[in-house]
């Protein structure tokens, strides 16, 4: 990066404001680099994607924002760093840092967006940190831009929560509401089914209809179906229109919509990309002329823009077209790649942000549901003004135990951050997965987010499904999403040699807790976990809840169906 090096240090040993600003940036500057002074720390987590040579890098975080645990930051650039199984090495460019300090307190720092600027953190070989801020395009930075969201405190949960509360108040850096202040789309309160992990993109009209019939006859009260990738009309991975591929879906969506029933499959959702398809919109498209006027060519693709009004008009057409075809909600994927599609042009960050803002506004205005996916860069995460569900992890894969363990570690840790503003989506799973099925079912149960199967409908295993739902398919959900217990937050449970404990506050003043052995090493095939009476007091730390001191605490083991007093 051709960045202007700034001499003044961003001093995190002395915090005066929850969002720090850089002032007096010289004119005609596109990118600045600021050294960061860290307080003394014991250990921490750096949140960044993995660095895969064949893949795009930051800011295309996709679903790959991962928690890289360290005792010293320079470990992350060491080739011997153990990492996270099923993932590549840590990217040194990231979005957040969580530290346990030598004084016993905690420090949380997160990159932020401005009107047309974006910051990110870089870990250097010697363990030092540099903060960059850029327009990522041809424009120059304004004289004053936001740098970092920062919070320090004695309790790890409240430190992160208070940081996000400050972010929600800053309308320049974010357009956010807390998870508890937003509506949760009704369909996501029920069990669903998705085409992706069963078919990937090999879907067509007859397969979907046959599976809907099989689902209805299965005795499993699945209440929504999500049709994932494989239906889109496109050329070279660029969208040509919002009508499905005519060879695969000759009837459009009419036949499929006719299978909706109030007491069976009530809702149907559809997958699309934020920018149309993986590589944007095709110049050879069938959009109405008024929609074409809202698009412009950039770097081989058509994109919505350049002003906010045109971008909003494109998303108004996008959402209304799919709503008119009968869909109740959308899974909008590939969100993190929208910014790279705009990069190198004018007002790249502002336009990419407008895409997220417009999507949110139109989904809300037209009363549709929204699942956010591959939406883990700052622009995506910090502009969920209405939607209340975002994927927090890399895809689940059938029969892959290492990937399942990594998936759980990432999901629970990322929920500490993303769970402040949305319910976490732990991805779909196969109930028939003989390796990971029960593992996945339990994590979905305490995530509080959407729960959707992806088995072939004839392969459902009821033992991994019925404990999650009532007779109408309504999910039993906790009062807040599950997060790691304090001793499990700043450790890598795949190498720690210890148990990994997560918990969520649940109904009637209860707390639901899972003790995992996620260790990848055969040396730790068995670990011991302890549950103490004092653990119950943490129920009020996960959310800002009123204290409920209890003289007696009862522990109920769901597996054995037995209870004992702690």
Where are these predicted regions, by residue range?
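Short helix/strand-capping turn motifs
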Residues: 191, 467, 481-482, 487-495
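Flexible loop/turn segments at secondary-structure boundaries
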Residues: 199-203, 232-236, 275-281, 337-341, ...
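Glycan-recognition surfaces
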Residues: 278-323, 357-462, 483-487, 491
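Carbohydrate-binding surface patches
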Residues: 444-447, 452, 491-547
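Aromatic-lined carbohydrate-binding/catalytic grooves of carbohydrate-active enzymes
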Residues: 186-349
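Solvent-exposed beta-strand/loop surfaces of large extracellular or lumenal domains
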Residues: 550-566
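N-terminal accessory beta-strand-rich subdomains and adjacent acidic, glycine-rich linkers
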Residues: 1-169
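Alpha-helical scaffolding within the catalytic cores
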Residues: 170-181, 253, 313-318
């Amino acid at each position: 990066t051709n960045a202007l090096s700034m001499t003044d240090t961003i001093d995190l040993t002395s915090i005066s404001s929850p969002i720090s600003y850089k002032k007096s940036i010289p004119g005609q500057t596109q990118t600045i680099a600021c050294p960061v002074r860290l307080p003394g720390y014991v250990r921490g987590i750096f949140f960044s994607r993995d660095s895969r040579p064949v893949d795009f890098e930051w800011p295309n975080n996709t679903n790959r924002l991962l928690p890289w645990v360290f005792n010293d930051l320079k470990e992350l650039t060491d080739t011997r760093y153990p990492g996270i199984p099923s993932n590549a090495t840590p990217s040194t460019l990231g979005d957040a840092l969580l530290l346990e300090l030598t004084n016993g307190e905690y420090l949380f720092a997160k990159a932020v967006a401005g009107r047309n600027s974006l910051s990110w953190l870089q870990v250097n070989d010697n363990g030092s940190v540099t903060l960059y801020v850029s327009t990522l395009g041809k424009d120059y930075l304004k004289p004053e831009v936001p740098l970092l969201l920062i919070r320090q405190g004695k309790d790890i949960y409240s430190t992160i929560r208070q940081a996000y509360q400050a972010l929600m108040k800053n309308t320049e850096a974010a357009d956010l509401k807390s998870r508890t202040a937003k509506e949760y789309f009704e369909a996501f309160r029920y069990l669903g089914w998705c085409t992706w992990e069963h078919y990937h993109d090999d879907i067509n009209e007859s397969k979907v209809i046959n599976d809907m019939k099989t689902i209805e006859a299965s005795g499993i009260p699945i209440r929504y179906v999500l049709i994932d990738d494989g239906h889109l009309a496109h050329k070279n991975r660029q969208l040509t229109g919002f009508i499905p591929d005519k060879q695969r879906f000759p009837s459009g969506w009419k036949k499929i919509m006719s299978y909706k029933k109030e007491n069976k499959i009530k809702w149907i959702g559809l997958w699309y990309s934020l920018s149309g398809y993986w590589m944007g919109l095709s110049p050879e498209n069938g959009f109405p002329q008024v929609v074409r006027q809202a698009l412009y060519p950039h770097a081989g693709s058509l994109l919505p823009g350049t002003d906010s009004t045109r971008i909003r008009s494109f998303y108004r057409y996008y959402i209304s077209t799919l709503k008119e075809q009968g869909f109740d909600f959308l899974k909008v994927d590939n969100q993190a790649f929208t910014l790279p599609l705009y990069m190198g042009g004018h007002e790249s960050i502002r336009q990419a942000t407008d895409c997220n803002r417009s999507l949110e506004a139109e989904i809300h205005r037209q009363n549709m549901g929204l699942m956010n996916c591959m939406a883990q860069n700052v622009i995506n995460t910090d502009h969920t003004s209405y939607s209340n569900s975002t994927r927090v992890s890399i895809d689940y894969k059938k029969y892959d135990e290492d990937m399942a363990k990594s998936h759980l570690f990432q999901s629970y840790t990322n929920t500490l951050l993303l769970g402040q503003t949305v319910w976490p989506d732990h991805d779909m799973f196969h109930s028939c997965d003989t390796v990971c099925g029960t593992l996945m079912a339990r994590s979905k149960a305490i995530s509080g987010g959407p729960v959707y199967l992806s088995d072939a409908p004839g392969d459902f295993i009821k033992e991994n499904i019925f404990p999650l739902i009532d007779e109408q398919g309504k999910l039993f959900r906790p009062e807040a999403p599950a997060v790691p217990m304090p001793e499990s937050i700043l450790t890598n449970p795949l190498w720690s040699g210890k148990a990994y404990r997560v918990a969520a506050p649940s109904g009637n003043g209860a707390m639901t807790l899972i003790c995992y052995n996620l260790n990848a090493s055969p040396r730790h095939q068995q670990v011991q976990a302890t549950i103490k009476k004092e653990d119950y007091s943490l129920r009020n730390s996960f959310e800002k809840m009123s204290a409920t001191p209890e003289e007696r605490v009862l522990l109920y083991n769901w597996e054995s169906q037995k209870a004992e007093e702690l």
